[in-house]
Amino acid sequence: MKRLLAAAGKGVRGPEPPNPFSERVYTEKDYGTIYFGDLGKIHTAASRGQVQKLEKMTVGKKPVNLNKRDMKKRTALHWACVNGHAEVVTFLVDRKCQLNVLDGEGRTPLMKALQCEREACANILIDAGADLNYVDVYGNTALHYAVYSENLLMVATLLSYGAVIEVQNKASLTPLLLAIQKRSKQTVEFLLTKNANANAFNESKCTALMLAICEGSSEIVGMLLQQNVDVFAEDIHGITAERYAAACGVNYIHQQLLEHIRKLPKNPQNTNPEGTSTGTPDEAAPLAERTPDTAESLLEKTPDEAARLVEGTSAKIQCLGKATSGKFEQSTEETPRKILRPTKETSEKFSWPAKERSRKITWEEKETSVKTECVAGVTPNKTEVLEKGTSNMIACPTKETSTKASTNVDVSSVEPIFSLFGTRTIENSQCTKVEEDFNLATKIISKSAAQNYTCLPDATYQKDIKTINHKIEDQMFPSESKREEDEEYSWDSGSLFESSAKTQVCIPESMYQKVMEINREVEELPEKPSAFKPAVEMQKTVPNKAFELKNEQTLRAAQMFPSESKQKDDEENSWDSESPCETVSQKDVYLPKATHQKEFDTLSGKLEESPVKDGLLKPTCGRKVSLPNKALELKDRETFKAESPDKDGLLKPTCGRKVSLPNKALELKDRETLKAESPDNDGLLKPTCGRKVSLPNKALELKDRETFKAAQMFPSESKQKDDEENSWDFESFLETLLQNDVCLPKATHQKEFDTLSGKLEESPDKDGLLKPTCGMKISLPNKALELKDRETFKAEDVSSVESTFSLFGKPTTENSQSTKVEEDFNLTTKEGATKTVTGQQERDIGIIERAPQDQTNKMPTSELGRKEDTKSTSDSEIISVSDTQNYECLPEATYQKEIKTTNGKIEESPEKPSHFEPATEMQNSVPNKGLEWKNKQTLRADSTTLSKILDALPSCERGRELKKDNCEQITAKMEQTKNKFCVLQKELSEAKEIKSQLENQKAKWEQELCSVRLTLNQEEEKRRNVDILKEKIRPEEQLRKKLEVKQQLEQTLRIQDIELKSVTSNLNQVSHTHESENDLFHENCMLKKEIAMLKLEVATLKHQHQVKENKYFEDIKILQEKNAELQMTLKLKQKTVTKRASQYREQLKVLTAENTMLTSKLKEKQDKEILETEIESHHPRLASALQDHDQSVTSRKNQELAFHSAGDAPLQGIMNVDVSNTIYNNEVLHQPLYEAQRKSKSPKINLNYAGDDLRENALVSEHAQRDRCETQCQMKKAEHMYQNEQDNVDKHTEQQESLEQKLFQLESKNRWLRQQLVYAHKKVNKSKVTINIQFPEMKMQRHLNEKNEEVFNYGNHLKERIDQYEKEKAEREVSIKKYKYFSNFLKESGLG
């Protein structure tokens, strides 16, 4: 509670300090001090819960005011609620005391009950109708106190009775915000279900989400995020919820917020309720300042999501840079921007106690700069505004270019330039046709490329940047104007890395590649008139989820002088362009800070600007960076124009080429067109050089092509042989490129790039007659790399060229021959590409080199055309490397060294005058798990190279046939993709139709809503009009009532005047009745005394009746409880009786069965007795038989002796017969004896069994008798209880009869009093002696009438009570009948 008061009551004085001499009593939950001296009797009684004392105070002669207040304006109801005496609260509410009284702190009794967690008291007050929306001194309502005490039931009851949920206290805390501070999850969830405002904020504009983050409750944060709260809202200091999470160190909540932000719609707007200014001149500021580290959150998303975010902004060019570099490319001006970032302090600052939750947040300022450069390049038919910026910048599409940027395959922006007679050149027609094919191929192959990060320590990051920037050397220019022009076109690589952080830098893979690219600087030379004005344009596209780099460069050759010293100066000042890019694996590559910074410095440091001299060509360089649907396109175009001094703009041939890459490949194609014209009006050479370096997704392939300079052609045969020796060698090139992969550490990789790009130099140009053009178009179809190389050597006399174009408008024979050679070469290169390339190519790194240009002498056109067929052989090769899924982490030091050493071998051959100046093309690829560096060194003029080239030509012819088959397969795939595209178009059209239907429905619904709103507004207006009419009618009604009252008073006054007149007239008549008046006066006094006595009796009777009623109520409650108990016992007894009856029945059955058994046993006994008698009868017979047997034995012995003595044989035989007879007789006699013994044993056993059964039956019968006795006792008890209840009923009836008698007496008294009043009225009407007597009599009459009404009402109340008693009697009789029925049932069951 202290926190609530401290938060809400700023500046409010607390309670006064207690007096040390007074007795102090503290309540349980009230934080004030109580003084008994300040309290009244009613307050002490209420605080102690003494209800009877309060009753005596209110009923006595001097009733106490229930709303009396103490010294601090607290009533008895306040004290009862604080101490939780619900009986006192009910008593006070029944006595109709004030429920919404405010104490000294503006709190109602309901607030005090909720503050002290007295639920019973609060429920009583709410049911009685206490106001729930009163506000105390601190702005808290009853709902605030319920939320603070974390009592969910009270919160629910308050809201169900209509408490306002959005009230703010003086600290601007709603109940929801207070619940969040208390970390009570259940109350927060309940308030949110009751539609509490989840976007509420306190006085410092901290939202509910921010408070939940500071409290560290992830569950409450999850609840708020489900309510779609404003995640991007800011407090007074501009800090968002995300930054609160970062500053408080709550990582899991921070991750939860980031996941929610990613799930938000793709084009979020600033949802800050207060609103932020978006009208700054820097259009990227809303995106950058909306959330902390917005650039990082943008770059962490996929390219598709980043593109959608950027597309939602204004149509101006808006650019977002990387958060680590802090650079945003926009208009040419540079505006610094401050972004506050939260930084974690030490662990000691963040360790705080859980109760206080005080957190310290510090913010450090970081500056980011915004810088862009725009260059306008003007072509004959079109002006294009191209944006140029650093390699790690992202440019947003303008209104003009947004449609182009959103497509997967960009269409070439070069418009065809027609000749004088409206015919297009052969080269242009061929280029546009090939571009269409490549557009289709890239549509087929387009796939989504995942964006990975490279985590680099900051030290490494800065070192690389420094080493790059240190090698950028600016040479002196002849004029300041030229210097300014070149500075406009130069890349600002130094400003890229100003805001690198000291901690690790997480760089997306695509951004890391861009940072490693070299900033190119282009010279601008003064224009001179020339015979030709070609414009070369190159467009490179990367499909969905890939970088699309379009780079067109046209390099102009300065006018050369014949002196060798001049040639050396030009060689030293030649323009060196290099574009090494570094791809990073899907896994993070961790590099030290030092090595990382060195890489950047060494790369950008090699950019050198050559001095601007008088020349014939004027290059215009422009770069355009756009964000398509899911891709980043970089378009770089450079157009170089040269005119002859004599003939201005006769011919304008245009060469446009397009190179496309599949979905997961980055292709860099760089074309350089070198145009040179001699100061004379003779035909000038315009050589063109195109080179390509491609890297697959998981392999870096380096394909290097080098073209070697041909010696100056003379009519002699020796010079022709030299030129043949300088041709390219196919066989050696294939042998070197088809070797195994070379896995190099990362450091070696970096060094090789540095040395390669560092040693590329430009040879000086001299006067010549021929115009060789070399163009290359390379496409990567479905996981294959196609290499198309076209080289056309053109040598024309200026006069002949002008004549052919001006007169006939047709291309020359040399052009036709060159196109034929180009077709042958394309077939060979396609064949080689389909054989070798199997790996998946995802990213390309282009390294641009410029081959030296040789000075050529004038020669006839015919001779040059003949020699072109023999000498324009080229060598192309593609190395396929199987893709692997992981990159190797390579050290930076070895990486840079190896690249420097390999590039060191690439040197320019000495320049010689020649009629041909072929262009070179180089393609380098590096595999995924290693660095495959295959470099083709310059071939010197040898006879051995010619033989190898001639041997390689048949293999090219064989490759053509294979390439045709591959082309057919590709065309079939193209048709399938076209069909798929048609199906998708149909689905899109259907989706658009559905969208249009939904929009129509939405419009209809909006119209309906508007109509409903109008009707609601009309109804509200009608209600307001009715209320206004009621307010107008109210005073009229009051006036009418007042007039009626006045009329009634006037009538009464008239009547009184008439009576006075009658009384005055009767004064004379009543003068003789003075004695009777005195009697009447005495009688009045007696009546007054009697009335007072009656009042006392009525009061005593009321009190007695109340006491009796309370006693009766208590007795009735007790009887009801007893009846309930009896009913329960009866039910239990019924159950037991039924159980016992069933048991008894079973026992009876058993007994009957036993009786039958016993009867059978008795019969057996009788049989046994008969057998015993028979046995006894057999005993004498046995004795006699034994005697006979003994006698026979003795006789036998005697006879034997006699026979022995006599020895007569016949006598022995006779004796044997006699013995056998006697033996037989004995056996016959023994058999009945055995039978008799057996029969005698069986009845004895049966008798034993029968005795046991009888004993068991006796025990069972004893138990049954005991149970019967118990049931009889219970029946007696029930009868006794019934008799007691009957006695109580009789008592109640007697009491009711006595009450009726008393009521009858009271009624009789009332009648007598009425008679007396009537009699007194009659007397008063008769006498009417004086006015002084009349008015008191009227008052007495009224008083008596009121008393009579009260007595009558009391009688009615008693009658109602009697009716209630009668109803209760009937209920009791019914219960008694039930008892009787159950008792009878028990008796019957006991008897049965």
Curated annotation (Swiss-Prot):
A Pfam family hit: CCDC144C
ANK repeats (start-end): 72-101, 105-134, 138-167, 171-200, 204-233
Compositionally biased tracts (Basic and acidic residues): 636-650, 864-874, 904-915
InterPro entries per UniProt: Ankyrin_repeat_domain, Ankyrin_rpt, Ankyrin_rpt-contain_sf, CC144C-like_CC_dom
Comp. bias intervals (Polar residues): 267-280, 576-586, 830-840
Gene3D superfamilies for the chain: Ankyrin repeat-containing domain
Coiled coil (residue ranges): 960-1168, 1270-1318
UniProt entry keywords in alphabetical sequence: ANK repeat, Coiled coil, Repeat
Organism superkingdom: Eukaryota
Tissue: Expressed in brain, breast and testis.
Region spans: Disordered: 1-21, 265-292, 558-587, 636-656, 671-690, 830-877, 904-926
SMART domains recorded: ANK (SM00248)
PANTHER family: ANKYRIN REPEAT DOMAIN 36-RELATED (PTHR24147), ANKYRIN REPEAT DOMAIN-CONTAINING PROTEIN 30B (PTHR24147:SF52)
Protein name from the UniProt record: Ankyrin repeat domain-containing protein 30B
Organism: Homo sapiens (Human)
Lineage: Eukaryota, Metazoa, Chordata, Craniata, Vertebrata
